[in-house]
Every structure is written in structure tokens, then in C-alpha cells.
């Protein structure tokens, strides 16, 4: 594949380095760079010590990147050192930008107006405390802030884009930062790529690996496509990047996957199972009955805006008594088959369907562990039922690997795919 412009990302913040705060900026920036056709060379995370930040900048430059993007360390406190370090690294003096200071002051006034606990008389001291955020490397370009921390672009080889840490402040200014002349100059050598995402469920990674090896041998020009695979929530996400002149190679690859793996390939346009289920539920009303997942499926269904149009309600029936009282499950059924059984899952779904007056119901009952398993029903045994008011039903028992959290999360994925298949009229296991 052709060599493109390359970038490196430096995430700063001791709270991110130590895991107290999850890095959401690195993956987001990486996706935006890839969309632009910019190759991502490295993502690094470092603490707030100036020497560590400068070491990361130097490392990126040594790797030959054209653009460095930093996030974090732009606040007014003593440990916010990114701008000072970038200025020193770029050999530029720190100067006060009067216009920027006034813009920050206006933002502070608005924030103070929303907080009656702050005395107006204290504004001058607050402005002085935030003056640090108006100190910029000489010759840099300011990106207007959403909060009080502006973005900065420092020209050079490599160019340095300095962005705030909070995603709600970083993401809105990205498009302006990327359009600045220094950044456009830095990424001028980028290559135009297409990126396609295929999602697969119910296929072992080893089977996909076998198919890709066969594709490499059978499809001319296979080396023109770049494939990455990721196992997430029990699904395989396969992302393929290629230049437009390799489109035919990708078409042959997608056809091979479709021919070999049939319904296991459930999305060729990147749509998630959550998106597909939401579309299939249009005009319907669903109710859920959950035991071991304790509402995680309902949470996943309602995570999408507009879900109130198709989600009727949910019941978490953890104990046997709750299954009987809330869902009408016959205690004799539980006594005969156990709470984790297909008959009980079917009864739970029927109870949810009737109790909420829904036309679609999904039930989950299982053993998430770490205790509670038996030789006949080990930890990871989970029973599912999807029931529609026209009589269509799908019931499955699976054994899921992993710890308690893994089993619960994967259970919601299995349930979503059973729901997708049942609503789509697709036969067979998920």
C-alpha cells in the first residue's frame, strides 16, 4: 500500500495513565485521522510531568510523523503543563494572547452567571487564575474554545495540534483544527482510502483466519488491502482499508466471506446488531425478562435515542419467588427443571409478553458465577427465549466463557442476535 502522511497521538494526564480515567480521546482521534487517510503511527499515554510529555513529543518526531496531536493539560492549574512543554519543544516563546484572554473572560462570566455561589467581586482573581490558558507559543494558531481551554496548532515539522482533555471540549473543535493551514500542510501527503466494516457473530476467530489465508492465496492483489480484526462482545469486527483502485479485491473478499459463512456475517455496512434490532423493532413493542443479566439487556435496548417507541418495559426477576410473582412462572416448573432451563426461559418470556401487553419478548436466565454451577449446568450456562405474539419462538441454551462480567455481557449479545434472527425469520443458531 502507498505510504501516506503519518501522525502520532500523545494523551497526557496522570489520571489517564493510572487508569482512574478511561482514555476516550485516543480512539476517537485515531478514527478521525484514518477517515482523512492519515496513517496512525503511535498512540502514547504519559503523566503530567513535563519531562515525560517532552519525551513523547521527541519520540514521535524521531518516528518521522508529520503531525503530532496532544490532548489534555490545558487547564489553569499547576499540573496543566502541555502548552509550556510544546512551546519549549518547538523552540517558541510563550506569549500572552490578549484577544484569547478576553474570550476566556467572557466564557468565565457566563459560567459565573449560572453559579450564584460565586461572588461577582471575585471575578478579577478568577480571570487572573485563568490567564495561564491565554499563554500560547508564539506564532501558533488559536482554535476557539468550547470551555475555557483553547486548541492550538503550532507550525513545524512535525506540526503539533494541542487539544483539550475533556471529550466534550475536544470533539467540537476538531474540524476547525484540522482545517488550519499548518495541519493541512502536514497531512498533504495523505492517501485517499476506503474503509469497510464487516461484522460477524457465531464464527470462531480461527475459522475467519482460515478463510483469510485462503483469500490471500486465491484473490490476486490481496496485499493491496489492509485487514484488522477485533473480537468484541463475542462478535468479530473486521475492518478493511484500501485505496480505490483495490475495490475489486475487497469485493471478491466480501463475496468469499458471504459464501463461506452465510448468516454468520450479519452486517456488511458496519451497522451494529443494536442498530439492526432497533430497525426491526419499528412498529413493535418489546418487553424483557432477565435473571442473571439483571437488566443489562433492557439497558442495551434503551441506550439508543427513540427507544421509548418500541420498548414497553422490563422485569428483573432474580429469585425464584420473583419469577413466580412478577412473571407468573409456575413454581412447579422451576422445581422440575431448575431456574436455569429452557422451560423457565419460555415461561419468563410468556409472562413478560402478557404482563406488558407487548408483541415481542426476550428472556434470559443463567449462571454467571463464580459459584452456583453444577456438573450438569456449569457456570456460563445461559438459557434464552425470544417469543413473538404470532407464535414464533426461538429458545437456546449456550455455555459462555469468561468471568461473571464477561458472561453477563456476552449474554446480552446472544440475546440481541436471537432477537435479530427471530424478527428477520432467519433459522438456525445465533
Curated annotation (Swiss-Prot):
Domain of life: Bacteria
GO cellular component, one term: plasma membrane
SMART domains in alphabetical order: MoCF_biosynth
Annotated Pfam families: CinA, MoCF_biosynth
CDD domains: cinA
Entry similarity comment: Belongs to the CinA family.
PANTHER family the record matches: NICOTINAMIDE-NUCLEOTIDE AMIDOHYDROLASE PNCC, NMN AMIDOHYDROLASE-LIKE PROTEIN YFAY
HAMAP family in the cross-refs: CinA_B
Name of the molecule in the record: CinA-like protein
Organism of this sequence: Mycobacterium tuberculosis (strain ATCC 25618 / H37Rv)
Lineage: Bacteria, Bacillati, Actinomycetota, Actinomycetes, Mycobacteriales
Gene assigned in the entry: cinA
